[in-house]
């Protein structure tokens, strides 16, 4: 039995249309809370043995074809407010990164690094997302969250274990809001900078394709577009190129011809196609260079049951 909710609770909901790659099986349950109080009540009443998986907009995610044996929690409109208080930008976890960057810039506050990061604020914090030399950790003050037990908490950034493309958030903890410190800037200049970032991204990344952003972490731990990485040799895309894997395919999955560290659904791909191609790239890059790439895309869920 699931606890009563004011939001939406759906059994056996396919997750494929909720991910950017458009693949994956169903969740046992999908819960979309109306607001924080609804989330607190639900988690507090939910059997502690039931796994919980917080999901953003699915921009950095492969859900395997067998689906997810968990309650997937996806925040919606009740969690996407953005407000400015002095040098602080407070954003709901469901607010899109790009919207937060634009809203802050309009108010003369600089969070422009978020403009080209796909996804929502909750995912950006969880992954310590970064671009153009800035990371969430450089600006984050604190987050609000609800623990797996249904307890609202405020956690300072220093307690989140933020590192390259990762954090140490407790399992099942659902982020609901993040507070950033943002430097002052001229709104027009900030807007121009974001336009330049978008143009640079669109000229080098397959933004018109179904992808989940960068597939593998850069081995040295630098952002693929960060200033510190512009002179660094160990870039994932370069290692993939040197292994002859630009454009490599498996089923409907492909390593992009435009940017070889982007795994795309070129049409009709399954999660198995995408993950299988990624694992093949890891294997062949290691054979070629002796360097083992690490996934940046999160992969979750079960393999499909063989019905033969």
Swiss-Prot record:
Associated pathway: Cell wall biogenesis; peptidoglycan biosynthesis
Essential cofactor(s): FAD
Keyword check for Cell wall biogenesis/degradation: yes
Basic and acidic residues composition-biased segments: 197-211
Polar residues composition-biased segments: 212-226
Family to which this protein belongs: Belongs to the MurB family.
GO cellular component: cytosol
Species of the source: Cereibacter sphaeroides (strain ATCC 17023 / DSM 158 / JCM 6121 / CCUG 31486 / LMG 2827 / NBRC 12203 / NCIMB 8253 / ATH 2.4.1.) (Rhodobacter sphaeroides)
Main function: Cell wall formation.
Protein name: UDP-N-acetylenolpyruvoylglucosamine reductase
Enzyme class: oxidoreductase
A Pfam entry, by short name: MurB_C
Protein location: Cytoplasm
Lipid biosynthesis found in the keyword field: no
GO MF: FAD binding; UDP-N-acetylmuramate dehydrogenase activity
PANTHER family on file: UDP-N-ACETYLENOLPYRUVOYLGLUCOSAMINE REDUCTASE
Known EC number: 1.3.1.98
Predominant subcellular localization, coarse grouping: cytoplasm
FAD-binding PCMH-type domain sequence ranges: 22-185
Record key words, sorted: Cell cycle, Cell division, Cell shape, Cell wall biogenesis/degradation, Cytoplasm, FAD, Flavoprotein, NADP, Oxidoreductase, Peptidoglycan synthesis
Region of interest (Disordered), residue spans: 197-228
Catalysed reactions, as listed in the record: UDP-N-acetyl-alpha-D-muramate + NADP(+) = UDP-N-acetyl-3-O-(1-carboxyvinyl)-alpha-D-glucosamine + NADPH + H(+)
């Amino acid at each position: 039995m699931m606890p009563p909710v004011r939001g939406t609770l759906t059994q056996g909901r396919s997750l494929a249309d909720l991910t950017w790659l458009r693949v994956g099986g169903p969740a046992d349950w999908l819960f979309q809370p109306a607001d924080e109080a609804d989330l607190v009540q639900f988690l507090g009443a939910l059997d502690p043995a039931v796994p919980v998986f917080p999901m953003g907009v699915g921009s950095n995610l492969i859900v395997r074809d067998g689906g997810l044996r968990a309650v997937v929690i996806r925040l919606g409109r009740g969690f996407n407010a953005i407000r400015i208080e002095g040098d602080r930008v407070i954003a709901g976890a469901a607010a899109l990164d790009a919207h937060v960057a634009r809203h802050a810039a309009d108010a003369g506050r600089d969070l422009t690094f978020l403009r080209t990061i796909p996804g929502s604020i909750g995912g950006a914090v969880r992954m310590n997302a970064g671009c153009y030399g800035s990371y969430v950790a450089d600006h984050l003050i604190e987050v609000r969250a609800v623990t797996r037990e249904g307890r609202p908490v405020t956690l300072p950034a220093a307690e989140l274990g933020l590192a390259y493309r990762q954090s140490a958030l407790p399992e099942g903890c659902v982020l609901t809001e993040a507070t950033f410190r943002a430097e002052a800037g001229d709104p027009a200049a900030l807007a121009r900078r974001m336009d330049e970032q978008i143009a640079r991204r669109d000229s080098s990344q397959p933004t018109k394709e179904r992808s989940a952003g960068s597939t593998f972490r850069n081995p040295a731990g630098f952002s693929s577009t960060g200033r510190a990485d512009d002179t660094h040799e160990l870039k994932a895309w370069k290692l993939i190129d040197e292994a002859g894997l630009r454009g490599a395919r498996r089923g409907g999955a492909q390593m992009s011809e435009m940017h070889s560290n982007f795994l795309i659904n070129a049409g009709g791909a399954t999660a198995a196609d995408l993950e299988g191609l990624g694992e093949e790239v890891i294997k062949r890059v290691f054979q070629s260079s002796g360097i083992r790439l690490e996934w940046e895309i999160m992969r979750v869920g079960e393999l499909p049951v063989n019905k033969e």
